[in-house]
Design a protein with these regions (language model features):
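Short, well-structured N-terminal submotif of metal-dependent ribonuclease cores
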Residues: 1-35, 50-58, 62
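Histidine- and aromatic-rich ligand-binding microenvironments
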Residues: 6, 36, 91-92, 113, ...
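Active-site phosphate/pyrophosphate-handling residues
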Residues: 8, 42, 96-97, 115
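Residues that scaffold the ATP/ADP-binding catalytic core of kinase and kinase-like folds
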Residues: 12-14, 46, 119
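Alpha-helix C-terminal capping segments
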Residues: 24-31, 102, 115-118
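Short, conserved active-site loops that position catalytic residues or coordinate cofactors/metal ions
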Residues: 36-47
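Active-site neighborhoods of divalent-metal-dependent phosphate/nucleic-acid chemistry enzymes
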Residues: 70-114
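Active-site regions of enzymes building and remodeling cell-envelope glycoconjugates
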Residues: 119-125
Length: 125
């Protein structure tokens, strides 16, 4: 089964100083993974945000590119209409969109978030 990685998984898997790096790194071993525009852009946004990691944009792009190459990650388009999302509250809009996108591609959404209620979600523990 292939997994679409959400932003939190990308952050934990790429930044070695992230507290969940060991967990993400171990979970990724031998798995088929995918990203999409939302997860990649979210990774770059959080990585470079002054109140988050405050990393350099070029370095963040380079690390993301190296991660994608190492894991032979598939890039899938975010091709579901946003207005058809099943989200009912603002805090679930992106999470549910990613779960529905993963499901539409026959994948699971890999995340650390336990609050996403969708059949396509696989929580990394």
């Amino acid at each position: 089964m292939k997994h679409l990685l959400d932003v939190n998984v990308l952050l934990a898997a790429i930044w070695q100083q992230h507290p969940d790096f060991p967990k993400a790194d171990a979970w990724l071993a031998g798995r088929q993974v995918a990203t999409c525009p939302l997860s990649e852009l979210g990774f770059l946004r959080v990585s470079t945000a002054p109140k988050a990691l405050n990393a350099d944009m070029a370095a963040s792009r380079q690390l993301l590119q190296a991660f994608l190459a190492k894991h032979k990650a598939e890039f899938i388009p975010a091709d579901l209409p946003a207005l058809k999302s099943s989200a009912r509250k603002s805090d679930g809009v992106t999470d549910l969109y990613l779960a529905e996108l993963a499901s539409s591609k026959g994948m699971k959404l890999a995340t650390f978030d336990t609050h996403i209620k969708h059949a396509a979600v696989q929580v990394i523990k």
